[in-house]
Each structure stands twice: as structure tokens, then as C-alpha cells.
């Protein structure tokens, strides 16, 4: 054998050994036609296994049903194929557990879920926190991925869990990227969703080729989609690579200054408390403005309202004060308010002063894709403002795009002309502007303030 052929043979042999080693890292989740090592929780939907394929069949008037592994998993890559009958909702639990429930003798399943959604909403492969926090990564964050799932066809799926990062994939494309530390270990489960009445009774969901890699789990290289980081005041390595920077690190507010030119923190009107920027009720110092101006940008933040409170996040902010007068910072406002208890939410026109609205200009959608958009009082909400280079601006609230408009359009100009801002020339039309956190003398807290320029 000549030297070249010997070298090629060694290379091929090494490749085969490497592939065989990689294949050995995978284990089947099912053993033949047996549910040995699995247990059912919740409702009484029917599960059967034949030729390595699991079929779940819906049963009317029973809670969500789960066929789960007895074993818990921490870091892993899970792959499977799934087929869902049109009209049925389902999911795959991971890093999940049970908690006591008076209505369920074996406890209530809770934890992360890879959604299987045949409805028009089409959020398959989004991440839902079953019986806990609700939607963590709705597929509205990655709109093109809504069209990947095929009802009543076999689809390939992949879940990657390594440390505090979770990525999901559907038919070879990345759907979600979550950073969260709530649960780091738990079982894997196959869900058949509860149904009301008999219309969808007997509907089926099928799984096959379930396999798991716990020996060498790795995250796939990010595909540049939006990353939802729930860990407060932090940036993951992929976020940094996308150009995100923190505007508050949980300890110091060095990226902000008082709009009145005084130290808002020495007056105790603003305070860093429990890793959040908190406005004290009854404070008089005023707003905080960013030290830097921004053009096209994506701004992420979390906010927490107390009952009856009012605040706001303003952007493309400019100083409209006359020469020699005190600063008069004005800009477009993402309204933050208790819709039920603060009187200003009832003012304006058709709800354009409610939470997440473009204040005094455009009301937020109260429902998106048949779902009521939540606005929490006393717990954290996720806000997001995206100002694209083409002038389009979006307001997001807890995973829903609730306002969208174009700065400088005819509609925008007409709305401004009929608002409290009509006397300010070129209102909201500057190429760049400051960000502003509004102090309305009510207790409101902010955290996880981060931005990237587009």
C-alpha cells in the first residue's frame, strides 16, 4: 500500500471511529414496546406503544396527561419525531417535576415544555412553563419559525439543555433560545392536553425515534435569533456577541443621570434595591435619562408596578426647553401604568393611555392571536421597544407585539397633530434621542435594562 493510500485509510478509519463514538453517546428513551422506566401523571389520556412509536389519545374531561420518565435529566440533547392531529394541543416536558395538588393524587406536573401547537397561533417549539410562569419564549419572538411545523405530518424536533441555556429546533431550524436558572433538572414527559367536551376526543399525537445524549451535550452555534434572558441584569455570551450591552448591572446606574441635573439617588427618590432601580412613592426629584443617545435600537427591560402606579419609558427623547429655561425632556412613551386603578389610563382616546400603549397616540392591542395580553401588578413584566432603521417601531409586552407604527408616516403625523404634542415641532422624529425612565411619584421598579443598536 502506498503512503498516500495509507494516509487516506487512516483518516477514514479515524472518522469512522469518531462517528461511532458520537453515535454511542446517544441512548433511546424507550425500550422496545414497553413503558418500563416511565410513569403517567395527571389525567387519564391513553398512551400506547407499538414498534417503538408512542401514541397518545385524548380523553374528554380529564386534566392534562403526561407520560414521563422516572429518571431526571440535567444537561442533555433530546431528539424526536412528532406527528399531531390537527386541532389537538400537546407538548414535550423537559427538566420538569411534580408538586402537590389537592385535585391530583400523584401531584401536578410543572416545568419547561416544548410546545406542540396545531392552532392558527402556530407556536410549536416555543417554550412554555407548564403550571408555573406561563410563556417564556413564545414563537412571536421568532416569527418565521411559526411556519415550520406541519400538522398531520412527521416533524423532527431537538431540545438542547446545557447549564442555564435552552435551545429548541424544529425541522432543522432554530426556534427559541432561552437563558433561565429556574429549574436545572427534571424528567422528560409526553403531554396529551386536556380537552373540553367531545369535539376533539380520540385525537392523536404520535412520537417516535426518541433519543437522548447526556454524555456529550453541546449547544448548537446560535443562528442569530432573539435571546430571551430571564436571569436578572445579566448578559449571556451569545447576547454579547449580538451586540447587547447592559444599562444597569443591578448595583450601579452609571449609564443614567437625573433629568434635573441633580443626584437623584442621594435624595433617596430613586434607589437601587434588591438589584432593581426603584422609584419611591412621593418622590420629587424627577426622571432619569440615559447618558447616551440612540438611533435604531432594541431596548429590553423589566418593570414592576405597585397598585395604582404610573410611570413610563420614553425614547427618541429631546430637550424642548427654551434657551435659559430648565430642561424639558420629551419623547415617545411606552406607557407603564395600572390600567385598572390609575385614572390616567381611562383618559385619552380609545385606550391610548393604557399600559404598553404609545402614550396619547396609539392604544396597545388588548388581545393578540386570540390571547389576552397580561399586564401584571406586583410582579415583573417584560417590556421591549424595537426601533428599526426604516422608521418602524414596535412595543412588546410579555411576549406580545402590542403596538406597531412608522415614525414620520402620514398616520403618525396626523396622530401627533391631534395629541398633547402637537405644539412641538418634529416631535419624536429626531435621528437619535435619549432614553428616559419616568418618575411619576409612584413606586415602580426597573431591572434588566439592556440595549443593542441596529
Task: List each language-model region with its residue ranges.
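Bacterial N-terminal signal peptides that target proteins for export
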Residues: 2-12
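N-terminal signal peptide c-region/cleavage motif recognized by signal peptidases
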Residues: 18-21
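Carbohydrate-interacting regions of secretory-pathway proteins
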Residues: 24-454
Amino acid at each position: 500500500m502506498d503512503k498516500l493510500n495509507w494516509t487516506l485509510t487512516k483518516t477514514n478509519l479515524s472518522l469512522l471511529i469518531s462517528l461511532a463514538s458520537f453515535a454511542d453517546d446517544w441512548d433511546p428513551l424507550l425500550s422496545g414496546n414497553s413503558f418500563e422506566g416511565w410513569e403517567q401523571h395527571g389525567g387519564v389520556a391513553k398512551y400506547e406503544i407499538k414498534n417503538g412509536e408512542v401514541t397518545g389519545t385524548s380523553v374528554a374531561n380529564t386534566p392534562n396527561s403526561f407520560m414521563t420518565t422516572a429518571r431526571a435529566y440535567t444537561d442533555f440533547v433530546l431528539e424526536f419525531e412528532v406527528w399531531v392531529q390537527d386541532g389537538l394541543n400537546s407538548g414535550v416536558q423537559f427538566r420538569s417535576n411534580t408538586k402537590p395538588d389537592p385535585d391530583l393524587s400523584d401531584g401536578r406536573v410543572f416545568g419547561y415544555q416544548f410546545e406542540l401547537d396545531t392552532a392558527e397561533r402556530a407556536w410549536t417549539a416555543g417554550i412554555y412553563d407548564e403550571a408555573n410562569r406561563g410563556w417564556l419564549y413564545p414563537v412571536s419572538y421568532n416569527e418565521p419559525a411559526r411556519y415550520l411545523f406541519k400538522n398531520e405530518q412527521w416533524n423532527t424536533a431537538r431540545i438542547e439543555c446545557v447549564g442555564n441555556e435552552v435551545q429548541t429546533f424544529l425541522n432543522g431550524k432554530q426556534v427559541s433560545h432561552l437563558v433561565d436558572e429556574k429549574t436545572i433538572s427534571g424528567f422528560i414527559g409526553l403531554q396529551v392536553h386536556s380537552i373540553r367536551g367531545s369535539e376533539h376526543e380520540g385525537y392523536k399525537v404520535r412520537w417516535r425515534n426518541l433519543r437522548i445524549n447526556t454524555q456529550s451535550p453541546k449547544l448548537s452555534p446560535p443562528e442569530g435569533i432573539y435571546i430571551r434572558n430571564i436571569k436578572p441584569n445579566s448578559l449571556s455570551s451569545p447576547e454579547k456577541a449580538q451586540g447587547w450591552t447592559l444599562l444597569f448591572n443591578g448595583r450601579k446606574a452609571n449609564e443614567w443621570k437625573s433629568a434635573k441635573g441633580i443626584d437623584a439617588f442621594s435624595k433617596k427618590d430613586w434607589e437601587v434595591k434588591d438589584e432593581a432601580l426603584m422609584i419611591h412613592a412621593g418622590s420629587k426629584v424627577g426622571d432619569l435619562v440615559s447618558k447616551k443617545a440612540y438611533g435604531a435600537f432594541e431596548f429590553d427591560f423589566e418593570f414592576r408596578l405597585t397598585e395604582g402606579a404610573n410611570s413610563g419609558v420614553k425614547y427618541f427623547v429631546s430637550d424642548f426647553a427654551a434657551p435659559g429655561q430648565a430642561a424639558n425632556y420629551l419623547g415617545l412613551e411606552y406607557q407603564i401604568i395600572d390600567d385598572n386603578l390609575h385614572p390616567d389610563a381611562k383618559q385619552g382616546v380609545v385606550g391610548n393611555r393604557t399600559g404598553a400603549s404609545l402614550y396619547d397616540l396609539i392604544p396597545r392591542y388588548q388581545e393578540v392571536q386570540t390571547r389576552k395580553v397580561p399586564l401584571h401588578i406586583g410582579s415583573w413584566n417584560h417590556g421591549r421597544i424595537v426601533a428599526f432603521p426604516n422608521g418602524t417601531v414596535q412595543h412588546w409586552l410579555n411576549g406580545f407585539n402590542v403596538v406597531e407604527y412608522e415614525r414620520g408616516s402620514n398616520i403618525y403625523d396626523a396622530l401627533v397633530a391631534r395629541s398633547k404634542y402637537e405644539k412641538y415641532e418634529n416631535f419624536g422624529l429626531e435621528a437619535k434621542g435619549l432614553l428616559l425612565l419616568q418618575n411619576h411619584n409612584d413606586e415602580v421598579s426597573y431591572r434588566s435594562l439592556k440595549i443593542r443598536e441596529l
